[in-house]
Amino acid sequence: MAHWTIEQEEAINARNSNLLVAAAAGSGKTTVLVERIIQLVLRDRIDIDRLLIVTFTQAAAGEMRERINAAFFKELEKGREDGHLRRQLYLLNRSSISTIHAFCSDVVRQHFHLVNIDPHFRIADSTETELIKMEVLEELLDGEYEKGNDGFLDLVEAFGSNKDDKPLEALILRLHSFIQSHPQPLSWLEEKIDNLALGEDNWAENPWASELSQQIKIELSAAQDILNQALKLSNKAGGPRGYLEAIESDQKWVELLLKAADQGLPVLYSCLQQLSFTRLGRVSRDVDENLKNQVKILRDESKKILNAINSLLGRDPLEYLQDLNEIYSLMKYLGEIIQSFAEIYQEKKREKGIVDFNDLEHLALQILSNEAVAREYRDYYSYLFIDEYQDSNLVQETILNYIKKEDNLFMVGDVKQSIYRFRLADPSLFLEKQKSYPLQDGSVNRRVDLNKNFRSHPEILNAVNYIFRHLMSEELGEIDYDEKSYLYPGLNTGQELKYQEIDKASSQEGKEKENTAKRVEICILENNPDLITKLEENETEEREIPGEAENDFIERIIEMDNTEIEALLIAQKIRQLIQEDIYDPELQCMRKIEYRDMVILLRATRNSAGIFMEQLSAEGIPVYADASSGYFDTLELNLFINLLRLIDNKRQDIALLSVMRSPIGGFSIDDFIKIRTKLIPRREKQPYSFYEAMEFYMEDNNDDLKDRLVFFIQRLKEWELESRIMALDEFMGKLFMDTGYYYYAGAMPGGGQRQANLRILLHRAREFQKSSFKGLFSFIKYIEKIKSSGSDMGNACIIGENDNVVRIMSIHKSKGLEFPVVILGGLGKNFNIRDSNENVLLHRKLGIGPRYINTQLRTYHDTIARLAIKNRIKLENLAEEMRILYVACTRPQEKLIMVGTTRQLESAWRRWSQPVNSYNQSRARSFLDWLIPIIMRHKKEGQYLREIAGGDWDREILWEDESRWKVKLISPWQLTAEEIRKKEEKYEWERLLEQGGYSCPSAESEEIIKRLNWKYPYQEAENIPAKLSVSQVSQISSGYLEDGAADTFLTRVPAFLSGEKDKKTRLSPADKGSIVHLVMQNIDYRRVSREDSINQQLGEMVEREILTSEQLAVVEVNKIWRFFQTKLGQRVLQAKWLFREAPFNLLIAASEVFPALESQEELLIQGIIDLYFYEGEDIVLLDFKSDIVHHKSEEEILAPYRVQLKLYKRALENITDHRVKESYLYFFDLNRAIRV
């Protein structure tokens, strides 16, 4: 951003305060955060390692570090010679820019003795911890069954199932997981369970009654609004005045109930017992039937609300109290079970030397509760930065409160984008500060609002503001979307003017063109099969296309579900968009829309992404889905995992038949039949498994099938033996080669994707080996656990960010991203409310809410605690869905298209015509139920929808707004007509080709011939690469590539094709050299005082997972120590400014590398300089070598590296504008530095 806004400057420059920055979507929060850090370092002279910067993800931490690094280099490029600045480049590598878990890990490793934990602990992944939890559950429940305690048996009876204890196990795991978001998990659980033991004397203090009263008041207010509307219609000319008495009576009842709700549930219950409704009076014959019917509908709706409230409080509050007292002992025992589970789980992890992410937070919390340790961190860090603060939880908040000073906290985020409640994020932490922190300067706690949007076109911002002004409220969405929350255009003046010119030009082409130019579009698709079947009745045109093909397509439309038909619509929409122009802010001109400009956002991709991919691919649209599922369902994974299962246990029919029928086995269905049928007359009983049938067949027969079976089983036995003695990843890699399956998968359609999926499986096996579980059986169990727990992932990503494809992703994954065109699909899908259907509900404030279950009578009903928590969870889930919708609507830069499907449009119109208020919005089933009622009330743009919906629309309830909407109601016939038109075109082309009646005009023929005969004018440059590494240039220049070697270099034959066999050694010389370079890159030179100090640092590198224990074993510490004892090593240790692993790009003439080349082509040379340091104003350059060279002469040693050092020197002098006075190669094999 060239210019900072006033609010951005405040966020950057404010000091001596705790600052909450409420940064709306697209407001440049990361840029502001980085600039504040830069100013603290450059202007306030604070070292970068004295700032603690906590990000939400590792990727965000990496991006933050890169931005800061780039900003430092930018200052250096300006000619700023500042020792403090150069020091920051050195300190940046060890600065505290990380996730909260990485910070907690550092705290625990530094103070492990305070919590009695092994400092070499490993962080387990989620699947490993799930497997341990299952072990713990089995051990725990077996022990409880042995005890035979009545309390436990009651628990099983209440929360188990008729078949097994799975529901009880799931309950224990869910409660244990939930309480981890509290600083004192088990204490919190005990306290909340004890709250169930209420007495009559403290009944009024319970939080559940208050929660229910608030919800009932919302519903009563809705009934009041409905009755007011009915009263207004009744008083109109022609209105049903005979209904006034009943409506006014209902109004009095509502007022009475509202007052009773303020006095508590017992009073409200008594009042509801007396509730009665007056019958509607007679009306005159000349009454307006339309008004009469509307009033009756409204009255019935208000009665429905009042009856629902009466049902909710259908029992005396004292009966609810009795329920809680009776269920208390059961929940108390459940609490004890969870405490036992937590203790055993912790002990299991301690034995295995692992921790999970929750452990990191709680251990860090325990350590920081020690005042001396907390003071140490408070004194060290000058400022604390928390990115994405809206996604914090109470544990993380408590950790940071321990180490913050009175006025050094900087929190940035947007509560409207808090969409991680399922990860136990607590947006109330942000909301509480947002309400309490003043905007004025001078307070130790203050707030800055960033609401200028630098991403989206103003027309999109207007639409977003219009929707959420009428949707997001404190009552339902947990925040009022008012003027302080609006998104305001932040684009620079030049760009705004350009947009105005484009929009003006579009609008001058007529009203139809003006509608097309609208940047926000909503499409309502009615997928009603009954409507589609009328196509044949209504369609009377004669068509050239055969009727059978048309009927087939109509039949296909009828069979499509909502997702499929929506995908078809979006595919058609993309085909239209690809012909349109779009403004490119970077190019500052109009250009054609490309596929890469478009993204399809879905609420969830698990069951939908595959359908969208299939439909778009069928339409010839290149597409990639960033899905979170489907990986283990792919053909290549299914077969290979079946092979692993078979090797582990041959008596598994499904796995066995799968592998035998595949190219790995090569058997046919006829072979299977032959194996089975040969046994029928000879055996008294059929074999238990197909493997046994194979064994019997081999005993009784001597033919080709027997030979193949013998060979197949022998291979299985060999693999079984190898699986026991080889490392898992090595064994799987060998299976790839032995079966040829990796290359077979690569030859299948989508082979690149399939091979990438197999490589991911190999990587998972490699990671699994680091866990506490070992062996093929455990790995298969690990994979099955991932699948059964719903932790499946999407296919491996094989595309880059610049590939020209339409992307499909979830709204969650799109957070923080932006796209020129966003298509938001699935708006008609129902919200997921499964988490409010559990037998025991949990809430961070309301506590625990169980159902009352009578195990003798096998009956159950809701306790007052569950009723209150269920209601609160529903409202919080709806608030989350609102924020998810907000995130989706704020991703586009130029165009937003929203698509939703409904099957019952008639009933939807009745629902959407209801008043827009919190009550009706709380009953929404989908995003469409929120969007359409609001758009219908747009005075101008909603007219189209109001005309279709019908009814009497009072102009007082319509809203004037500057937002512009393109609203379309699309029937299945429109989709069908488009597809039939395409089929007609195809049929016509086929007819012409068959008749031979089509030929190209002569001018077109000449152009085709001209293009076919065209030759590329720069053929000599075709074999020259665009870029080379320094090592490759050195090889070429030093004669290592002789005649014809350039071709070999450019088209290297893979090892598996050249016949070379894989090395059996685990670490090659090149690997060992990389390890030495890794050590020299990460070792802290300031701590090098003796050989032991290097050993200590190497141990720390293993702990920090920079090195593995296998890699550590090959490091020759004595050789590293000898380097530091040399004169050059001493100069390195004494250097004030020292830089390691410095990457560079250098553009040179291609003829410098390939002298025979006559063209003026250029080459990009890439390299990484191991180390350089300053002595005065000059630079000393050093490159480490681990080659075995003691048998060579000095000239032979230096020959391959002269060009390399020359390029390093040239690049350094260009970048730094300082002279390189000396260049050295240090050979660890010689323990000697050689000057070049």
Curated annotation (Swiss-Prot):
Its cofactor is Mg(2+). It catalyses: Couples ATP hydrolysis with the unwinding of duplex DNA by translocating in the 3'-5' direction; ATP + H2O = ADP + phosphate + H(+). Keywords: ATP-binding, DNA damage, DNA repair, DNA-binding, Exonuclease, Helicase, Hydrolase, Isomerase, Nuclease, Nucleotide-binding. One of its GO terms (molecular function) is ATP binding. One of its GO terms (cellular component) is cytosol. Its EC number is 3.1.-.-, 5.6.2.4. Residues 515-816 form the UvrD-like helicase C-terminal domain. InterPro entries: AddA, DNA_helicase_UvrD-like_C, DNA_helicase_UvrD/REP, P-loop_NTPase, PDDEXK-like_dom_sf, PDDEXK_AddAB-type, Restrct_endonuc-II-like, UvrD-like_ATP-bd. GO terms for biological process: double-strand break repair via homologous recombination. Pfam families: PDDEXK_1, UvrD-helicase, UvrD_C. Residues 2-457 form the UvrD-like helicase ATP-binding domain. ATP binds at A23, A24, A25, G26, S27, G28, K29, T30. The heterodimer acts as both an ATP-dependent DNA helicase and an ATP-dependent, dual-direction single-stranded exonuclease. Recognizes the chi site generating a DNA molecule suitable for the initiation of homologous recombination. The AddA nuclease domain is required for chi fragment generation; this subunit has the helicase and 3' -> 5' nuclease activities. Belongs to the helicase family. AddA subfamily. Heterodimer of AddA and AddB/RexB. PANTHER family: ATP-DEPENDENT HELICASE_NUCLEASE SUBUNIT A, UVRD / RECB / PCRA DNA HELICASE FAMILY MEMBER. This is ATP-dependent helicase/nuclease subunit A. The lineage of its organism: Bacteria, Bacillati, Bacillota, Clostridia, Eubacteriales.
